[in-house]
């Protein structure tokens, strides 16, 4: 998981309290129930400490990969700390309403030999709340701004960028309180 400490539109959005826990923690907890190892890459020490306390493996992101950096170089950096993995399933920190079943589906597709799986909106535009990549595909990725997923999965979750998005997600998450989907 990539989890920046700052955000232009909604300051420190990943750290915002979402029904009793930082927003990013909703997906960390889902991933910890699904995957044997969960990695969190961040430029924020507090986020890394919280992730480690929850059971994830923290990866300190170097300054050259902070700011408006495409995700692929950040994933490639994180891959250096992941021994023996055949691929990654990256889940956005700011999409706390992702259904864990969708994450599991991405993992199953990766295990079946697909090299790139992403989520999409209902209008079929690429969303990327989940981005699964085989190790080989990730290591050899050419165009960071032009993903070519083999499989697109429909994801109705909300991506939080603004206070309005956060308020919407807060209402949804109240239904799940301490047990995220």
Regions found by a protein language model. Give the residues of each.
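Conserved N-terminal catalytic core of the sugar/cofactor nucleotidyltransferase
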Residues: 25-84
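Glycine/Thr-rich phosphate-binding loops of Rossmann-like dinucleotide-binding domains
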Residues: 9, 48, 98-99
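Short, well-formed alpha-helical segments that are part of the catalytic scaffolds
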Residues: 10-32
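Short glycine-rich anion-binding loops that position phosphate/pyrophosphate groups of nucleotides
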Residues: 5-7, 64, 93-96
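Conserved core of the sugar-phosphate nucleotidyltransferase
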Residues: 53-54, 69-77, 84-87, 92-167, ...
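Short beta-strand/turn micro-motifs composed of small residues
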Residues: 3, 42-43, 92, 120
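Conserved SAM-binding loop
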Residues: 16-17, 40, 90
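N-terminal nucleotide-binding beta1-loop-alpha1 segment
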Residues: 1-11
